[in-house]
């Protein structure tokens, strides 16, 4: 309800701010940034009060804009984010946009462009809103660094370091960076136990779950102009490790001594590398560009669990797996302006492969024996080709229309335990209209058909030994096809005021869900039809009329979905479909004192998952924190903050059915509750 009141109050607040600005603030500062050819230009002066260290700090302060990295998919087509650098999207797929922007010093940024309508479609087809970071032609050498120390109330300290340096070498701007972090030290403590169908505990006991993770990353990038050619290159190397050890001691209701000890561990070691680049030049009135990428990754995983009666011989189940992934991508595009039309044509070829070996074994914790049927080995390869043509048409100064037609051809082959080869073709049309009846108001409508990509891991067997569940591989999977409808409106006022609202509806064919197999197992399979719908609201509300420098931001996302359950044929939501998320933060800037105060809250992740004989439900999670930031020391940004200082508690309920969910007969309920430590952090950023 408070959120609804805030949104309802927007028009009157907007009118108050537009009608009477404080005497000390000029109308020019309170006005929207200049709108030129569909672009709102944010010069460095706009961000002066924020004293940004890098381009990421600047983009993060563009009102009404959130950085989106794009989808984690194979190839370039669906992986594009909503940030461009000098009019081009970064070639790297392994790095997120914030990391890339953090390596661009703020004093090397000429301007930030917020593109909408035809301007966005011309540079990034399919995107509703795009930010373009334009660097200075005479960019200077310089570097930046960030050191952060995170602490938990139990006493564990987590350090992280990022540093990058940009230098001019001949015609190239060269940037090198390093990141290293001990980024996870969760000590989850709590209890769990089994209940009868009436919710009465039959057994329960304490649980201790400790997790540790660390990673290191090296990056190198170069770009420059050589006559008519523009060149960009990038490379990165990543290595990470994860460790988890857990133990649970269970005591029957009414007893004084435990009767069973459950324990297990999980490990993951990962190494990835990526090399990519693009070259661009004008050819006969067209701007041609070719982008190339090569990446590879290796993972080794172990999952072990045992549920052992005290005094009895120990028995454990263990699942070992290793995999190697390869991706090679080439994309060629040509674009040209024909009067009111911006036309782009192109094609893409992507090759991806997965080599996977998994072994399930049982033993006493020291010696494990695998049965022949418990060994899974497979190789999956996909060759995907895509051709497209798009037209961004400026019908009038207030109306633009973007139309795209894409054809996708793919062949997926699988060798090993279940050899198979299949080919697919999918047309993917998209139509988007943007109407701006007057400055500050934008309406948009979109219709798009997109096609998901299959997770190669679903072709191979897998296991969650901690829950005692195994999934079979399915070589017959088909990708999901979505028909999406979106309507949205945006209202801007003053220097930073923004209100965004949108509704969406999705018709899904071949929805992926866990289904029972003929042999009595469980595998990922396709549901013929499903639907999903919801709305998004977001608000940036300056409150300078109440207190100079005060600002509130908030967002709310609501989703619902339905499909016919493949087992019961009843209607239910998707697995993993959380209904809503709420996020809000408030900040108070005091530029004269070079001080900023803030607080935030996040609520969401009420998920459900379904298996043929089980249902899982997770509680809603509430996170909150606050911070103080100072730039009183020349060249440094220092921030001290806390997150969930009193800790956090969440739960999971697993309901087991006999023989499966069709019967409605509950055999037992597992209740699991975990608590985390409160955390604090100290961050120091600087330049050199």
For the regions a protein language model found, what residue spans apply to each?
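A beta-strand signature from Gram-negative outer-membrane beta-barrel systems
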Residues: 106-142, 687
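Outer-membrane beta-barrel signature, preferentially recognizing the C-terminal barrel domain
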Residues: 264-272, 323, 376-382, 446-500, ...
